[in-house]
């Protein structure tokens, strides 16, 4: 995709503060220190907007409201720092800190780029900006607005995962949209104003275990002491993405299928459980290869209400923990019982979260990382049908589409609520073409069989 860069600006936040703010990182933040950034692009259709009106009216509103919303999300304008004398990195926010905003223009077909159909990953990559990262400093937020003249625009967001989780990221996007449309701060979003790290009560010693795990991730001697991110998977021209939909009726049929195929009556048949199990089995089958290869899969659980005392809803930062499944082989999910096996595993996990402590959950994740083999197939779900990203209306209508752009790099698939139906899901998939063809065949044919 050819882009014409219009400008690169630095957006400052509105603040009366004169002193720098230093935020230590908690266990929940440090977990994501070496993960690739959260990348999302959200598309907005403009039916009657010329190029001139966009730059004279719409863009200034987006910029002004961005400056205002940053005052409620202070850490996003700061930087991640790791000084040689410090045992761990921290976030530093200076009153005059700014966020990078790139404005570009593209002649690409907006309808195609923002569709749910198969699209080349390389065609969408230019729509998200990169973070500035060095060994001792990293920006935390970078934004890009791409205008498709007389068609629409997109907002590309890249966030360092160390600063916030998906729940807080969705609040940022929706709050920015609300301020842009209404000119006022939203009153019902539980804005993340609590920066006090002492509200995170976890056992001592867990933070150090994160750094000890670094030697299993990279053989580089100084890997644990640098902010530089690990090399991302290369995205070739044979990587494609698609957005699939599960209607509320589809999900009910998945639940009925689980009931019919399982001998158990105690299953936790939530939308999340049955949908994840279905996508997981399709992904394992589409990968091919050795049936005895290891399969490792994960999801992130919100621990705000699971800590003692609970974390305030207005806390700014990460509070999710990866729930790891690393003792399985592909054969578990390949046969006719593959789907119900996945349902039972995930059901037991979700239902048992309340009785598990953080140490035991961490130990499973630690073991999975230490013992992961080169031929391990990794599958992780990102996003949630609770985030409500399609509710972010900047004043020109709700998004027509949103894509998580970090799927292929992180071996993820995305899950979110459907735009136009309560109870349904959108599933974002990014795979090589050969795997995608098999995956789509399985996803649709399996559904036909069990309808």
UniProtKB/Swiss-Prot annotation:
Q: Which GO terms describe its molecular function?
A: acyltransferase activity, transferring groups other than amino-acyl groups
Q: Which SUPFAM superfamilies match?
A: CoA-dependent acyltransferases
Task: State what induces this protein.
Answer: Up-regulated by high sucrose and by low phosphate stresses.
Is Acyltransferase included in the keywords of this UniProt record?
A: yes
Q: Which InterPro entries match?
A: CAT-like_dom_sf, Plant_metabolite_acyltrans
The EC class name is transferase
Belongs to which family?
A: Belongs to the plant acyltransferase family.
- Key words, A-Z: Acyltransferase, Transferase
The name under which this protein is listed is BAHD acyltransferase At3g29680
């Amino acid at each position: 995709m050819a882009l014409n860069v219009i400008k690169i600006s630095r957006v400052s936040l509105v603040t009366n503060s004169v002193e720098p703010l230093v935020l230590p990182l908690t266990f929940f933040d440090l977990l994501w220190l070496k993960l690739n950034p959260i990348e999302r692009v959200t598309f907005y259709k403009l039916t009657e907007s010329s190029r001139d009106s966009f730059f004279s009216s719409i863009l200034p509103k987006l910029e002004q409201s961005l400056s205002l919303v940053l005052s409620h999300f202070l850490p996003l304008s700061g930087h991640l720092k790791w000084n040689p004398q410090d045992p761990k990195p921290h976030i530093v926010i200076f009153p005059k800190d700014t966020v990078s905003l790139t404005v570009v223009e593209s002649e690409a077909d907006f309808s195609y780029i923002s569709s749910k159909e198969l699209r080349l990953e390389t065609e969408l990559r230019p729509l998200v900006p990169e973070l500035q990262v060095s060994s001792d400093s990293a920006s935390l937020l970078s934004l890009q607005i791409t205008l498709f003249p007389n068609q629409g625009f997109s907002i590309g967001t890249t966030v360092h995962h160390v600063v916030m989780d998906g729940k807080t990221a969705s609040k940022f996007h929706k709050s920015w949209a609300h301020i842009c449309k209404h000119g006022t701060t939203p009153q019902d979003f539980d804005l993340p104003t609590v920066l006090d790290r002492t509200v995170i009560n976890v056992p001592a010693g867990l933070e150090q275990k994160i750094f000890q795990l670094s030697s299993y991730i990279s053989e580089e001697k100084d890997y644990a002491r640098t902010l530089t991110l690990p090399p991302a998977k290369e995205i070739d021209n044979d990587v494609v993405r698609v957005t699939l939909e599960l209607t509320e009726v589809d999900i009910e049929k998945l639940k009925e299928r689980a009931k019919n195929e399982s001998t158990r009556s105690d299953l936790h048949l939530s939308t999340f459980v049955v949908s994840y199990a279905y996508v997981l089995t399709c992904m394992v089958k589409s990968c091919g290869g050795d049936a005895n290869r290891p399969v490792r899969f994960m999801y992130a659980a919100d621990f705000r209400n699971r800590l003692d005392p609970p974390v305030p809803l207005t806390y700014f930062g990460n509070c999710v923990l990866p729930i790891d499944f690393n003792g399985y082989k592909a054969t578990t999910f390949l046969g006719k019982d593959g789907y119900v096996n996945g349902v039972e595993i995930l059901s037991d996990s979700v239902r048992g979260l309340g009785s598990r402590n953080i140490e035991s959950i961490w130990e499973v994740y630690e073991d999975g990382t230490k013992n992961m083999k080169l031929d391990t197939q990794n599958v992780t779900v990102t996003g949630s049908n609770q985030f409500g990203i399609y509710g972010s209306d900047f004043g020109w209508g709700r998004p027509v589409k949103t894509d998580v752009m970090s799927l292929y790099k992180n071996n993820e698939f995305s899950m979110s609520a459907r735009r136009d139906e309560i109870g349904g899901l959108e599933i974002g998939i990014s795979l090589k073409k050969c795997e995608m063809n098999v995956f789509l065949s399985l996803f649709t044919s399996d559904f036909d069989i069990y309808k």
